[in-house]
A protein has these predicted regions:
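Ser/Thr-centered flexible coil motifs
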Residues: 1-2, 136
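Short linear clamp-binding motif
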Residues: 2-25
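A polyanion-binding, active-site-adjacent surface
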Residues: 17-18, 22-172
């Protein structure tokens, strides 16, 4: 084994313990963030997060929106989808992905035999930006704290970020 191969092997072992390879095939949750939702009731944590968003202060998005668009689907799902933000239809209904984008998402999920109610869906921002504009960087930054908590509570095995805004909210 060359020195370079040995270094690659050592780096790989830092991430994967060959004695615990069965973890990859288990249903054990993956802990991505420092909060420990397994110690508290998931429903209580989601309710608190929703209340925090409903009580957010000095937020132009909240002031211009009709409803909080929090989430939809199964909170115990292994799959979580994060979209950009609510549109007009989502603002009226109070659920993510119910407008034209929702119809497309439903078709995509159906094509791969996944029922929408078997996944969990939320957005980067939870209030509709005026005129369906893209959320501004300051809004994305402000709401990313809530999104990270949301992801931590749901703790999915698969996280699907729909678009550049979702990517930006988590990775800058």
């Amino acid at each position: 084994m060359t020195l370079e191969e040995k270094n690659q092997y050592e780096i790989l072992n830092e991430f994967i313990d060959p004695n615990e390879i069965e973890f990859i095939f288990s249903d054990k949750p993956i802990n991505r963030f420092k909060t420990k939702p397994e110690l508290e009731d998931k429903i209580a944590l989601l309710t608190k997060l929703k209340n925090d968003l409903q009580n957010i202060k000095n937020c132009e998005l909240k002031e211009s929106a009709k409803k909080l668009v929090f989430s939809d689907g199964n909170s115990n799902s292994k799959i979580m989808i994060v979209g950009e933000g609510p549109g007009q239809k989502e603002d009226e209904v109070g659920k993510p992905f119910v407008g034209d984008a929702g119809l497309l998402l439903n078709k995509m999920l159906k094509a791969i035999n996944i029922n929408r109610q078997d996944i969990y869906i939320t957005n980067v921002v939870n209030y509709r930006p005026p005129n369906n504009r893209k959320p501004e960087p300051a809004e994305i930054t402000r709401y990313s704290e809530y999104l990270r908590k949301h992801i931590s509570i749901i703790n999915p095995k698969i996280l699907i970020l729909m678009g550049s805004t979702a990517m930006e909210s988590l990775f800058g």
